[in-house]
């Protein structure tokens, strides 16, 4: 138990250090600017950094980024193999977070390495995958046949407004995950993560350590 506490303490220090800039690099000017960037089509997003991202699934494709005017050139947004990759090309420190707004016709996957807040709405597809390493906060709403979540670190993932027929969750670390699954839920937990579910699915679970699988209380109960 002492070893686990030490690991979590060190992890927290690393996350806080990254957020506030132990190696700050370029200092933000404080002058906010909004850029629109033209991008090729993509079906998945990879975020490496501490960005606040809002994604809406709709017919048109658009990308807008807001932040300090001298910081925006340091953020790379490239599409390769149908994946939009968002990352820093140089370290920086800022007083307000970088804000990214995206609309995309079809989003099938999200990969996050780092922190930040990500909100995805309007999904309607056959499968949606989330793979994250770090301490992001993620919210997703819409409908899908299969939701597949793989986490390590201290993620907070709220998909209880993403209606799915099947859910697959593999959580390592101290994550908190909330899902809405109708038919089948497969859960593997390693460590003190908590998975909460809504619905009445058939459950297959494997839990190593103090992790928990809990049914969400009915609203208004």
Indicate where each model-derived feature is located.
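Positively charged n-region of N-terminal signal peptides that target proteins for export
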Residues: 1-4
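C-terminal motif of bacterial Sec signal peptides marking the signal peptidase cleavage site
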Residues: 14-17
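Short linear S-[DN]-x-LW-Φ motif typified by the pepsin-like aspartic protease active-site region
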Residues: 19-91, 97-103, 198-199
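Extended, compositionally simple hydrophobic/Ser/Thr-rich segments
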Residues: 35-36, 42-55, 92-102, 106-221
